[in-house]
UniProtKB/Swiss-Prot annotation:
The protein's name: Hydroxyacylglutathione hydrolase
Gene name, Swiss-Prot/TrEMBL: gloB
Source organism per UniProt: Buchnera aphidicola subsp. Schizaphis graminum (strain Sg)
Keyword tRNA-binding listed: no
Taxonomic lineage of the native organism: Bacteria, Pseudomonadati, Pseudomonadota, Gammaproteobacteria, Enterobacterales
Subunit structure: Monomer.
Function: Thiolesterase that catalyzes the hydrolysis of S-D-lactoyl-glutathione to form glutathione and D-lactic acid.
Residue numbers binding Zn(2+) 2: 57-58, 127, 165
Length: 250
């Protein structure tokens, strides 16, 4: 299985998996036109669409795509059922496509029913975890988001994160405002800034890298607590809440 992506809208990524037989799967098509053009140009056969959650920049292209390719199966969580989904997925489901198994994990926090799809080594985590950051928390579900990103953190270190937005520089800027002397974050920021200036992307990224530069995956560290003026016994969850609220206002 080969991974590629299309940049759409302002900063979204649509992820595409395809095989040697030119069959493909797309994840979170926020638009239709660019995706259809790509499929036609590559002469791919679209087999399935996977949706992580019900925000328009992730589902906006579904209707037009299935109008063009009516035999496509659309998978998504319960919250996406009005988006032409014909296969509702839930925690623990295993989707068998293109001779591969795709595991479904409930990763709420950004939305109540947000899911992620795991096809080793890739995790398509939508708006749950970003490079250098995490998604906004709606409906005050901070513990849900905390659990979700820590679940992703628990995956094998060689896991490849396929996030849905190019927010990396902004996230690293925030991280440096918290930890201005962190050499790993500063070095990675310079690397990604150069990539972006060359019209390259920062994604996908390994979980191994994220554990080093993503402060939302480091909320148990004494250095972060000290930098934020918190007591040593402040819980990782409390640190996460404070970080996420500060990022909202950054």
């Amino acid at each position: 299985m080969i991974l590629t992506s299309i940049s759409v809208l302002k900063d979204n990524y649509v992820w595409i998996l395809y095989n040697d037989n030119c069959s493909c799967i797309i994840i979170d098509p926020g638009v239709s036109e660019d995706i259809i053009k790509k499929i036609e140009k590559k002469n791919w056969k679209l087999i399935a669409i996977l949706l992580t959650h019900n925000h328009i920049d992730h589902v906006g292209g579904v209707e037009e795509i299935i109008r063009r390719y009516p035999n496509v199966t659309v998978f998504g969580p319960e919250e996406t059922k009005t988006r032409n989904v014909n296969k509702i997925v839930k925690q623990g489901d295993v989707i068998k496509l293109l001779k591969s198994e795709i595991h479904v994990f409930l990763t709420p926090g950004h939305t109540l029913g947000h899911v992620s799809y795991y096809l080793k080594p890739y995790i398509f985590c939508g708006d749950t975890l970003f490079s250098g950051g995490c998604g906004r928390v709606f409906k005050n579900k901070f513990f849900d988001m905390y659990q979700s990103i820590n679940f992703i953190k628990s995956l094998p270190k060689k896991t490849i994160l396929c996030c849905s937005h190019e927010y990396t520089l902004s996230n690293l800027n925030f991280a440096m405002s918290i930890l201005p002397f962190d050499k790993k974050i500063k070095k990675y920021y310079k690397k990604i800034k150069k990539h972006i200036s060359q019209n390259k992307t920062s994604l996908p990224v390994s979980l191994e890298t994220e554990k080093k530069i993503n402060i939302f995956l480091r909320t148990n560290e004494k250095t972060i607590k000290k930098a934020m003026g918190l007591k040593k016994d402040t819980s990782s969850f409390e640190v996460f809440i404070l970080l996420r609220k500060e990022k909202d206002d950054f």
